[in-house]
Amino acid sequence: MFKKILVANRGEIALRIQRACRELGIKAVMVYSEADRDAKYVKLAEEAVCIGPAASSLSYLNMPAIISAAEVTDAEAIHPGYGFLSENADFAERVEKSGFQFIGPTPESIRIMGDKVSAKQAMIRAGVPCVPGSEGELPDDPVQIRRIAKTVGYPVIIKAAGGGGGRGMRVVHTEAALINAVAMTKAEAGAAFGNPAVYMEKFLQNPRHIEIQILADKYKNAVYLGERDCSMQRRHQKVIEEAPAPGIPRKLIERIGERCVAAVKKIGYRGAGTFEFLYENGEFYFIEMNTRVQVEHPVTELVTGVDIVRTQIMVAAGEKLPFTQRQIQMTGHAIECRVNAEDPYKFVPSPGRITMWHAPGGPGVRVDSHIYTNYFVPPNYDSMIGKIIVHGDTREQALARMQTALLETVVEGINTNIPLHRELMVDAKFMTGGTNIHYLEEWLSHRAR
């Protein structure tokens, strides 16, 4: 096992990794930007290193600064968390070439799965169902592009091969708009991701977003930890997640989970990963794989009892998975609300000083957050300041616990989206379960009328 790990991230996930290290008796070195000098995990750290100014490009995305911090503190491994450099194959490669262990998959796996075209091809080879679309990257010839769209059937969606997080995509309803949409997406993809390649998929009208969590070690052992329903989204950004997914037959989940495990073994994947699917009319369609820990990992932890971050560290240290598929049992229901420092309905970021913070408590309530009273939320990063997660024996009990937890939560001094969550937890359709990925945006536009 490692003696010292450097945590190359910030916010609640930095604190989450720090906690996992403590439990394993590992020293955690925290890195921070000048804007995060007063972060809770920095104050709690045995060792902390400032890696640059507030701007992410000069700190959390600054590879030489992070690797230097690992060198001066004698760390053995680097945990990238999520976001920032977590899915950057070049960073993983530089970490390993510098003599450190990257807590995540190999650079090759990140490269394959990070490019949406090669990921889709790898999944087709492994027998994982994919959204109908172009075989690979779209050609330059407009005639061929039109032919592919005709075969797939309108509406189609044009996606950037190097995209992610809901960026770099365009829905096309008619042939007249097709070529222009492809050209614009290519130009955007080149500017945003350094890769102008785009591909085409059938645009599903009312899908749900269902994802399968996997864990694998380097000895070709792999398990899936059930599913999560992340359909409550706004602009492709998840707002509420839950596990298990309401109303999907277990047999279907088992079948798709087993295919994900087979795919992981086929590509020699190690660590934690998530297969994201669109689910419509009883069918699963692969869209992408995330080669890192996800924001919403706690809902899976609560229903399976598996500590995903701890297991990530253990398999990176060369240990075997400490459980088999048969030992993974899902119990009860978990729901997570992402708490963002923003206007609850206009979504304008709301950085500033928190004058009062009171976290909820009680049976089955977990709060993952790095904030505290008098903490200053910097304007430089993502607006998420924490997550409230609940577990109950049934979905109804989990909903009741979340309603209570949200009523107990106090955040003063800044705006948060807690009022939005309070409304959604008593929304009739959400309470029934099984809403699609467009539901929240439709709900918001209806509310604004």
Model-assigned labels for residue ranges:
Residues 1-126, 138-147, 397:
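ATP-binding N-terminal substructure of ATP-dependent carboxylate-amine bond-forming enzymes
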Residues 133-134:
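Conserved beta3 strand of the protein kinase N-lobe
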Residues 7-23, 48, 71-73, 96, ...:
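ATP-dependent carboxylate activation and anion-phosphoryl transfer catalytic cores
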Residues 148-157:
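Acidic/histidine-enriched active-site and ligand-binding environments that engage anionic O-linkages
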